[in-house]
C-alpha cells in the first residue's frame, strides 16, 4: 500500500482523538452545512402514479463550504413496476447506479442502440447528449436509482430534453417553427402535429414522462437487452457491477465495496470512485479520512449517526499565535435518502443504528488514499515514529503503542457493548461512546 506524507493529516487525526481536551464546537443536523436532509433538500421535478424524479439542491447553495461541488448534482429516480421513463437526453454527464429493483437501460446513438439489463449494484455512465430510456420490467418490485449529474453548459444546472409531448413536458421538437419542421420531415405540419405532438392539446398523453407498459411491450424490450458485465469491472462503455468483486474491507461487522478510477475507464473519465458499504446494526466504520477526495454519501437503507471533525472556519483568518486550536464537530442522524458530504482530509466516523447500506461518490478520486485513525490495519497513526508520538501526545510512546494495539479489529468494530456499558454509567451523548469503542 502506498505510503502517505502525512504531517497535516496526522494533525487532524490527533485533533480527532484529543478533541475532548481542546476547545470544541458542535453543530448538529439543521445547523450542519454538510447534511442535506431528504425531506427538505430535494426538489420534485416530476411525480405521478407511476414514479417520480427528484433533484437535490445545489451543494454550494446549502453552504459556501461546498463550493467545490458546485458542478455536481444528485438525482433520485423511482418507478413502479411495468413502467418506462420516456426517451430524452440532457446537457449533463450522468453516473447512474441501481440501488434496488431491476431495469432495462437503452442508450441510443446515431446509427445504433444498446440495451442492458441492470440489477442492484450496477453502474453506468451516460454521456451528455445521449438519448436514453429506462424500463422497470418487474411485475412487483419498484425501481430505485441514484444519479450523479455533471452539467456541461452551466455550473450546477442542466436541462432534460424529452422527445415526447406530455402534460408535464413539451417535446423539444415543438420549439422549431412550422416551416422548419415541414422541411425537415418533408411533411405538412398538420401531420407532424398529429403524429408527434397530438393534434389537439387534450390528445396528449396524460401520464407524463413515466408511463405504463403492457406485458407484451416489456417482453419485446427485454428480448433485446444484454446482461450487465459481472465478470469485469473495467468495461469502457457497458454497465459494471460494484458488488461483483470481493469487498476491499470486510469482517463480521461490515463490508466495504469500491471501484476506483484506476480500475474502470468510465470512472477515470469522470475522476470519481464508487463505494457501497454495509454496516451491521450497532457497528462502527472506524474513524478515517480521505487524502484528496470529497465524498458524497447517500443513505440507501437503514439509519446511522455520523460525526465529522474539521477546523473551525475562523482558523483560516489571521489570528494571534497563542490562540488555541478550535475543533468543530459536525453531527447528524441519517435516514434513508439523506445525503452527507465529507470534505477531503476531514476525519469522520459512521455508527449504524440499524442495518445500514450507503452509496458514496468520491470526487477528485484519482490517487486518493484512505487513512484510518484506529484499528489494526491501514492505521496511519501507528506509522508515526515513537519519538514523534512522544512529542505529539501527552502519554509516553509505550502508552500510545499499548493504546493503539488494544483495538484488534480493523475497519469495522462492534460498538454495542461499549454503548451499553456507558449507558449504564449515565453518560450522555454518542461521542464518548464512539471514542470508547475505538480502543
Curated annotation (Swiss-Prot):
Organism: Glycine max
Biological role: Seed storage protein. Accumulates during seed development and is hydrolyzed after germination to provide a carbon and nitrogen source for the developing seedling.
Cupin type-1 domain: residues covered: 34-193, 240-401
Note: Mutagenesis of Ile-145 and Lys-147 allow the creation of a beta-conglycinin beta chain containing a phagocytosis-stimulating peptide, soymetide, found normally only in the alpha' chain. The three mutants created exhibit phagocytosis activities after digestion by trypsin and the order is wild type < I145M/K147T < I145M/K147F < I145M/K147W.
Tissue distribution: Expressed in seeds. Not detected in cotyledons or in mature plants.
Glycosylated residue positions: 351
Signal peptide residues on this chain, from the entry's feature table: 1-23
UniProt-recorded name of the protein: Beta-conglycinin beta subunit 1
Spans annotated as Necessary for sorting to protein storage vacuole: 430-439
Keyword field contains tRNA-binding: no
Modifications after synthesis and translation: The N-linked glycans are not essential for the folding and assembly into trimers.
